[in-house]
C-alpha cells in the first residue's frame, strides 16, 4: 500500500494481498472474473442469455440469503453503463433472468464545473446514492400501490392455475419476487443510508462510491449474500467518470482522484465491518479486471496488462496480514 492510501494502510492487518492475478482476456468485461469461465475477447461484448451464470447468481440458485431482502445486488448500476454498454459477467445467464442481480440506479451531481472536462483523464467527483429503480424512479408508484399490484397478480395467478395454464409460471415467480423485494420494508431500510449518523456518512464519503459501500454494508447486515460495486459513473449521461482505466494522465489521476476516493470509502468499509464483527463471516474483495503495464506510455498513462495484477482479500477465510506471489522480469 503506497503513501497515497494512509487510511487503507491501517486496515491491512485484516487483509491478504495476492500479487499474481493473471488471465488471457484483455477486456473490461468482468465475465471471467465473475463466472470462472473464459470471457469475451472483444471489449464491447454485451451479455447474452447463453452466458454462464455469475457467482452471485449461483448463490441465488442454491437458495442462500434471507427473505425480504435481495440476495444479490449490483451498484451503482450495470457494468459498462458509463460507455453505453452492458458488459457480460454479473448476470444469471442460462439460469434465466430471475437470477440476475438487483441493479440499482443513480443520478449523479457534481460540485465543480464539468464544462469542457475530459472525464477519462480529468474526472469530476460524482455525488449520488444508490436507489431502488422501481420505487425511486417513478413518482406516485409507492409501496402501497405496488402492494395492490402484487395482490392483483396473485389473484390472476390463482385463476390461471385453475384453468390449467402453467405457460408463464416462471415469469410469475420472477414478478412476484420482484414485487416482494421492492415493497419490503427491510429492503428499503437497507438502502436508506440517511439512517446512518452524519459522521458515518462523512467517513465513507458522500460521493457515489462511498454511498454505495455504505449501502453495501447495510445490505449485508440485513441478509444480502453478494454485493458488487463497479467504480464507474456517468458525466452528462454519455462519458465515463471515475473508472480505473488511466491510459493517460495516470499519475495525476491516481494522486488527485482515484486513490483518495478509494482510500476513504474502502478503509471506512473495512473498519466499520471489523468494528461490527462482520469480517468474521464476510469476504471483501478489491480488484480490477487486469493489471496495468509496467512501462508508461507517451500519454503518461498505463495500458492493460493481463499478465499480472493484484487482488486484496479482506475478512473471512483468508490468512490476514499476508502477501502472496511476486512478479518476474517479464
Functional labels for PLM-detected ranges:
Residues 1-330:
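Ligand-binding pockets and gating/stacking loops
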Amino acid at each position: 500500500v503506497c503513501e497515497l492510501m494512509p487510511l487503507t494502510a491501517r486496515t491491512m492487518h485484516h487483509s491478504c494481498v495476492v500479487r499474481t492475478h493473471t488471465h488471457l482476456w484483455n477486456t473490461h468485461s468482468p465475465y471471467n472474473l465473475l463466472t470462472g469461465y473464459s470471457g469475451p475477447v472483444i471489449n464491447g461484448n454485451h451479455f447474452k442469455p447463453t452466458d454462464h451464470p455469475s457467482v452471485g447468481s449461483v448463490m441465488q440458485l442454491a437458495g442462500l440469503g434471507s427473505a425480504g431482502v435481495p440476495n444479490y445486488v449490483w451498484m451503482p448500476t450495470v457494468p459498462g453503463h458509463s460507455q453505453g454498454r452492458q458488459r457480460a459477467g454479473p448476470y444469471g445467464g442460462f439460469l434465466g433472468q430471475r437470477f440476475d442481480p438487483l441493479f440499482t440506479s443513480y443520478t449523479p451531481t457534481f460540485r465543480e464545473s464539468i464544462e469542457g472536462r475530459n472525464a477519462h483523464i480529468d474526472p469530476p467527483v460524482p455525488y449520488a446514492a444508490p436507489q431502488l429503480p422501481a420505487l425511486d424512479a417513478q413518482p406516485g408508484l409507492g409501496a402501497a400501490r405496488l402492494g395492490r399490484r402484487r395482490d392483483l397478480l396473485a389473484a390472476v395467478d390463482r385463476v390461471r392455475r385453475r384453468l390449467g395454464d402453467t405457460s408463464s409460471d416462471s415469469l410469475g415467480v420472477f414478478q412476484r419476487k420482484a414485487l416482494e423485494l421492492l415493497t419490503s420494508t427491510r429492503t428499503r431500510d437497507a438502502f436508506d443510508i440517511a439512517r446512518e449518523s452524519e459522521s458515518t456518512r462523512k467517513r465513507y464519503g458522500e460521493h457515489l462510491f462511498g454511498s454505495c459501500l455504505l449501502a453495501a454494508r447495510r445490505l449485508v447486515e440485513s441478509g444480502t449474500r453478494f454485493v458488487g460495486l463497479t467504480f464507474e459513473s456517468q458525466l452528462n449521461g454519455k462519458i465515463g467518470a471515475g473508472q480505473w482505466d488511466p491510459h493517460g494522465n495516470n499519475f495525476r489521476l491516481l494522486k488527485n482522484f482515484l486513490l483518495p476516493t478509494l482510500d476513504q470509502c474502502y478503509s471506512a468499509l473495512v473498519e466499520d465491518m471489523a468494528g461490527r464483527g462482520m469480517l468474521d463471516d464476510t469476504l471483501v474483495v478489491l480488484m480490477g479486471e487486469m493489471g496495468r503495464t509496467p512501462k508508461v506510455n507517451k500519454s503518461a498513462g498505463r495500458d492493460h496488462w493481463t499478465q499480472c495484477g493484484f487482488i486484496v482479500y479482506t475478512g473471512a477465510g483468508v490468512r490476514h496480514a499476508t502477501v502472496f506471489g511476486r512478479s518476474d522480469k517479464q
